[in-house]
Amino acid sequence: MDKMSKWIVKYRNMILAVAIVLLIPSAIGYFNTNINYDLLSYLPSTSESMKTQKILGDDFNLSSVDFLVVNNKTDQEAAKIKEEINKIDGVEKCIWRDDVLDISVPKQAIPESIQDMLYSGDSTMMIVTFKEPTSSMRTMNAISKIKKYTKDDCYLGGISAISEDTKDQTEHDTPIYAGIAVVLCMIVLFLGLESTIAPVVFMLGMIFPIVYNFGTNVFLGEISYITKALAVVLQLAVTLDYSIFLLHRYQEEKQKLPNEEAMAKAIKATFTSITSSSITTIAGFVALCVMQLTLGRDIGIVMAKGVVLGVLSTIFILPSLLMFFDKTIEKYKHKTILNELHKVPRFVIRHYKKILVAFVLIFIPFGYGQAHTNIYYDLISGMPGDFASIIGTNQLKDKFDMTTTHFVLVDDKLTTNEIQNMCSEIKDLKGIHNVLAYEEFVGPGLASNFTPSVVKDIFQNGGKKLIVVNSDYKAATDKLNTQLDKMDTIIHKYDKKGMIGGEGSMTRDLITTTNTDFAMVNVLSVIMIFIIVALTFKSFALPVILVLTIEFAITINMGIPFFTGTTLPFIASMVIGTIQLGATVDYAILMTTRFKEELSHGKKVKEAALIAMEKSSVSIMTSGFSFFAACIGVSFVAKMDLIKSLVILLARGALISVVSILLVLPSLLIFCHKFIEKTTKNWPESNMEAKGE
């Protein structure tokens, strides 16, 4: 690394020039990366609901379905609206009553079940199907055009419409999130660093890995809107301490060496230090990639890539910036507020046993709270009430009793009698509002100019028959999941291969999938961190102690919502623990490394712990408070509950982690020092008492 460090310093201006040029293709990549706003599309393709969605898309042209509520319009005006919607690119078909019965015929001639579905007082409903899935930009653009055309007393409801509103909100909010995170991180850096200019230089340096990370996402094809919204905040919070370490080491080396030699030494020391800590952070994000819900892979890859790019930028690009602004950095200085702690370390040394007792007593109730925190899977409930799509979805519920729509697929070889009997049994289930099948359109008593052949194309394709079932229950509730289970039983009585699609079925699969993912990701992330720490320190005891300390912080963080009565979004329980584990392990490694270093210098156990706490405290607090500031700032402006909940948990987790590392970790290091000595290769032997005790 000596030669590499000297090469970086020698060619620093050329490296910076190349880095600036690389921003151009990265920016192009960013603007060409698709964003997925449909979280349900991340379900495994092997799940029944996703298989059903594929058939609905391939055979029935129902890749994406929304419902348009048209208020206070005549049938003639409604027909005109439908005609214009059908002209919009991306719309497969807008389906209304005139597809099967001319509007000159009184609506009373329509079967009662169809009347109930299409009319409610002065309102009527149209079914809008799209050529491509919900997450497609073509579908998003089509929805945007529909909303612009029908803005007068018409509301589009459904998952696709909600996704389009989410897109608009995210595109508006993401730059604001980034701006707030940068400003608040800089404020924390001003409090913790003597140099007034260094925080600005750090932010200039962070531009490179952030832009590179977003630009290289183009190779993934697409990323989720959650990843897009949080990536800047997380990358800033997780990798900023690498920059701080390089600056501190450079300033230290400058006291005894010329600037270029000092920077070369600083680069080498920084690379050695941040490589081990960054690997643990990367491992935490990589653990997300094993999730069946591929949203985890999406977040995991982007954030792991962001950490790698953060390390590379710190080693290759930041040295050039620090040396370019060197005189300015040294010239403008101010008094810091975040200084080394002295009273807290002494308190820990005196009361470490009491701290550990408190640690156990706190862990138990919060562990219970974490296991019993309420989780919501309903993607609609976390959206702002002023979204046009939410207003439309609520109107579907209030006016047409269409809270959730199920799409049932059965073999087209089933007889009319079997279909009617099956529909009758489904209608009798509690919470079913109505059932619509092709068989409703055929039979005696219908108008002579009724055209069932048009309807047949909608309800029968690809060897399957489609049955539409409207439920009074909300998706992701126990009532709806029980209803789906009973529907499965009825359907499979007539067709063993019968399937149910739609939001309700997909959300049921989401619950099943995430329950498995949650346990798997947590276990894997702990194992990966354990192995890396064990290899780093060549120890068995230290990974146990470090992971236990961090899991304590995670348990407190995830247990608090139980006691406050807060319901968390499903994604929080899967990703927060992993992110907090990956970010916090850096602090733990920093303090443990300093503890070992002081022991190797002949210090007693308590004295070594005291010095480790004092010398590590500023770095830990600056990094942790930066993480907190970046996330808490976003929470004040985030309108979507899913984003807001995630950043609040991350912000609170950062503070809890700082406290845990400063209080619990040194207490465990002191208490377990003999265990550490016996299970760690080349660990310095030492007695307990500090000098003067």
Model-derived regions: residue spans:
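Membrane-embedded transmembrane helical bundles of large multi-pass transporters/channels
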Residues: M1-I35, T134-Y377, H492-E693
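Structured non-transmembrane domains adjacent to transmembrane bundles in polytopic membrane proteins
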Residues: P44-D66, V70-S163, N374-L542, L548-T567, ...
